[in-house]
A protein has these predicted regions:
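Mature catalytic domains of secreted/periplasmic carbohydrate-active enzymes
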Residues: 1-400, 411-439, 447, 451-453, ...
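A short tyrosine-centered beta-strand micro-motif
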Residues: 404-406, 459
């Protein structure tokens, strides 16, 4: 369904609804008036309302997903006889409407979606037409289905779009963007009351910025065009936080520091922005892995820019005494200027006071044949156990001796399998527990792995499968270290 006045197909908001207004034109004109770049969404590969389109209402019982596609996800390999019909759809509707959008509305960006529903060569044919029509238009990676390179996945877009609703992120090369929603729906859903808090979404924004990513936050307008008051409140609260802390995410990006006990950091030149998700009880944070000298520190929200007291505790750790308290919405940000931000150590400081979550996405990944979750809730995992050469490694350090309860957070895959967690002389072997994975509704379990006592200094924690399975042993989310 076209949300603009389309001359290509009469199934559009002007010709097919009583509303009769070209909202695309109105949005484009408003963006031009306010100096905002204008982008459009176009589902080039999935069309419920077109007889020749993949996933249409006539041929499939579930137009919203892959299960009803003839032959499954790669239906075009199973049923090549359908390709002429699909090519007709692309030639008569998909490409003409895309070119129409470019000509009539001159968007700065086209956000494509559901490329897996088309053969790759058809997606590339569409991309070629787009580049010919407007060479400098920005196109996301969902124009085509990803393809494998040795050690990585490639795409033909100008930047990478993550999976839907990702809130945890693997380290990535190049430009990328995550697309979380305020609840669990992209369109308006009156029964979906799973809205995240503004504070949660601000943390997602900071975590993405720390790894060089952008956030495209989705809300679903109601049928009359108004925005759900719950969404309005979320956006206003995020806006309030951004008015004070904008520089920490808009001007800053990929950090050279590792994950911290209290949160994350972003970096602009030799200026770190320390995002304090968990305000310490004693009002002091320890910055781990920092080998350069600190020149100055202050609270970003402090209009007087009062210097914060800081001291070096050892060659890798600096302690900063905070001022004020954590805000009601969002989190506090510390500005920390240093001599040389490249002088850091990836060894992660582990707190002896609060629980540490060693996320799989933040591990050093050894071996091959891994599969990764897309980062959304309950799907932020690494599949471990396709071969016994696989290993997830976390390098940590402690400033004082401590004892921890260790637990593994994961989802079991198929039959129980054996894995180990080791750290120096500590070795804990366990058999996976819980119910086998249900693709969409699985929850993680936390399995006790025993008590780990460590002296001050550097240590290496490893998780590895003790046996291999074709479908892996587990979907590992994290290891937990709880001080005793």
């Amino acid at each position: 369904f076209a949300m603009w006045d389309s001359d290509v197909n009469e199934y559009n908001i002007v010709d097919a609804t009583p509303y009769g207004r070209d909202v695309m034109r109105e949005l484009k004109d408003a963006c031009d008036r306010h100096g905002i770049h204008f982008g459009v969404y176009y589902s080039h590969a999935f069309d419920w309302g077109e007889a020749n389109g993949p996933g249409n209402d006539w041929d499939y019982e579930n137009p919203g997903g892959n299960l009803g596609l003839f032959g499954g996800l790669k239906w075009y390999d199973e049923h090549p006889e359908l390709l002429p019909r699909i090519r007709t759809y692309i030639n008569r509707k998909s490409i003409p409407q895309i070119l129409e959008l470019i000509k009539k509305y001159d968007p700065d960006m086209i956000w494509f979606d559901t490329a897996s529903k088309l053969p790759p060569e058809e997606c590339l044919r569409i991309l070629k037409k787009v580049r010919e029509a407007k060479p400098d238009i920005v196109v996301n990676s969902r124009i085509t289905y990803p393809y494998p390179f040795p050690g990585r996945t490639g795409h033909f877009g100008d930047y990478l779009s993550t999976g839907d609703r990702a809130v945890e992120f693997l380290p990535r090369d190049g430009d990328w963007e995550a697309i979380p929603t305020t609840n669990e729906s992209y369109g308006y859903h009156k029964h979906d009351h799973s809205h995240k808090t503004p504070t949660y979404l601000i943390e997602v924004l900071a975590k993405a910025a720390a790894k060089g990513g952008n956030i495209l936050l989705n809300i679903g307008p109601r049928g009359d065009g108004t925005i759900d008051p719950v969404d309005v409140n979320i956006l206003e609260k995020i806006g309030d936080w951004m008015k004070v802390n904008e520089a920490s995410v808009r001007e800053a990006g990929t950090t050279t520091l590792t994950v911290q006990p209290w949160g994350q950091s972003t970096l602009d030149g030799n200026r770190f922005y320390l995002h304090v998700f968990d305000w310490p009880e004693d009002g002091k944070i320890q910055v781990g892995g920092l080998e350069t000298n600190v020149k100055a520190a202050r609270m970003l929200a402090d209009p007087d820019q009062t210097p914060l007291t800081h001291q070096r505790l050892d060659s890798m750790t600096v302690e900063i005494t905070l001022q004020g308290s954590t805000p009601d919405i969002g989190h506090a940000v510390v500005v920390m200027d240093v001599n040389d931000a490249s002088k850091t150590d990836d060894t992660r400081l582990v707190s002896t006071k609060i629980e540490t979550l060693l996320h799989g996405f933040d591990s050093r990944i050894i071996g091959a044949d891994y599969k990764y979750g897309d980062g959304k809730a309950r799907r932020d995992y690494i599949e471990v156990g396709r071969n016994t050469d696989q290993k997830l490694v976390w390098e940590i350090y402690l400033r004082e001796p401590a004892t921890f309860e260790v637990s593994a957070e994961y989802q079991r895959i198929e039959e129980p399998g054996v894995f180990t967690v080791t750290c120096g002389t500590f070795e804990s072997t366990a058999t996976t527990e819980g119910k086998p994975v249900d693709e969409w509704f699985s929850t993680y379990i936390q399995q006790d792995m025993g008590r780990l006592s460590l002296p001050a200094g550097k240590h290496t924690i490893e998780l590895a499968p003790a046996e291999a399975r074709p479908d892996a042993l587990m979907r590992l989310r994290a290891l937990h270290l709880k001080p005793q």
